[in-house]
Structures are given as structure tokens and as C-alpha cells.
Amino acid sequence: MKLAIQHATLYTYDAPVRSSTQYIRLTPRENSRQRILEWRIDTPIPATQTRDGYGNVLHVLTLDKPVSEIRIRAHGIVQTRAPDGENESLSPSDAGFPANSSLSPLVFRRATPVTSVDKALAKFAHGHRKHVGTLAGLRDLASAIADRMPIKPGDTGATISAAEAFAEGALSVRDQAHVFIACCRHLGVPARFVSGYMHSAIVSTDGLIAGHAWAEAWVGDQWHSFDLATNWAKNRAHLALAVGADYLDACPIRGVRIGGGIETMLVQARLSVSQ
């Protein structure tokens, strides 16, 4: 399947931004499940391209003159290949392939402030410890989290910790992924966060979509995906942008600035099947 993606982000400010740096992770990862045919990042001035510590393509945009708005646009076409049969739950990122030898999966056993557990979440995780080292056990864990934490439509607010999200009980796909990752790491299983998009039969008629997120866990010498929001439903295609220890490592755009006053952000993403 060929997916055409257009992603536009507009930041506006009620006072001039004196200087800013934006860290942009809007270039899809290339692997056995997805291959870039065309891709472009448009920024007010040329951004520096590099790779971060997780292997994501990273564009760094630095503006050192006053501005009242910042526009960032990513667009292109990606060829995707869907999983087959019993491999349905395997990830678009690295599924069926050994881990990148330069980055051990053990890196993803370390808890972050966003993926730390409290007593309540630790108790919940321990209830699934018996079979957590198996794919079936992790699927049971993912299902239990999804049942306890149904998605609240439209909830894409500030990033909160896994423990806070678990206590709230009904939040975003980001929070579901963080809780799953926190449980995995607490039980000794490497797990990581994935940001990206999802195309499905229920996508809006105008092609507008929201960003998507899921988790991956390391079992049997490969990464397996766990999309708690959709359970990898049929008629879908997942497109991975970036991976990281949590959302803060893998979010599409993250920045710092001096000045600017109140910031307003408008994001619009459109995805369609290309011929």
C-alpha cells in the first residue's frame, strides 16, 4: 500500500519570539515494513538533518530572529507492507529483524519520569508477572490496560506520567502506551514508545487524521507491537515516525524558545492511499 501523507504544524504567538529551536521528528522510519518513496520537510529556513540516539531522522530548526509564527510542513509518499497471518501483531518498525546492534534493547528497560510506576501501578503490573515474558502474556497485559483505560476522544493534552494516567483511567493513546511501557519495564521487559499515523477504514472522508501512538516490547529477539487503542484491527496501516523511551523522545515536534508570550498550535494531518 502506498500512503500519501501531509502534515502541517503552525505555531502563532501573541508576542515576538526572539529565538527558538524546534526538534522535528516527522520523517518515517525505513525498515522491512515501510519504505520512503518521496519525502520533504519544509521549514522557514533550512533545518539541519541528523539522527538522534534512537536512530530517528531528526531535523533541527533554529531561528535567531524575531518571528510571530512558525510553519513546519512534512509531506510525501511511503510504501507500506502489512503483516501476514500469525504475524499480525508484529511491528512496522523492525518486526522480524534483530535489533540494531548499536542500541541494545536493554536500554529500554530503564524507567523515565513519564514511565515510572507508583504503588497502584506496580501492584497492577505484578498481577501479570507470571507470563509477562511471553507474547501471549503481554497481549493479556495490553488487553487489561485497554479495558481499564478506554480512550477519551479528543484528549491530547499535556503529557502526564503513567502513574497519573493509570489513576485517571480514561485518557489518550499516548497514556495507554506509557502505562503499558511502565508495566513492562517494571517487570523487566524492554519496551519503547512509537509515534506515527494510522490509516483505517474509519478514517474521515476528507482524509484528516490525528497522530497515533503505540508501544513495542522486546520478546523472542524481536520487537512486537501493542496498539492498545485498536488491537491492530483489520483494514488499517500503521506508519511509524519515531521511537523513544517515551513520548518526549519520539514526539513529532518539540521545541524551546525565548519570548513569544502565549503560544497557539494548530496541527493538521491528512493521509490517503496513493495510486
Segments predicted by a language model, with ranges:
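Intrinsically disordered, low-complexity N-terminal segments that are enriched in acidic
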Residues: 1-95
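Flexible, active-site-adjacent loop/turn segments at secondary-structure boundaries
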Residues: 11, 15, 24, 34, ...
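Generic, ordered loop/turn and secondary-structure boundary motif
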Residues: 14, 18, 25, 55, ...
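Short capping/connector residues at structural and topological boundaries
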Residues: 18, 22, 31, 68, ...
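Hydrophobic/aromatic-rich core segments of domains that either
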Residues: 20, 143, 175-263
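Residues in well-ordered beta-strands of folded domains
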Residues: 25-27, 42-44, 75, 216, ...
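Short, surface-exposed linear segments at secondary-structure transitions and domain or protein termini
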Residues: 47-50, 96-97, 233-241
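Secondary-structure boundary elements
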Residues: 93-171, 179-181, 247, 258-275
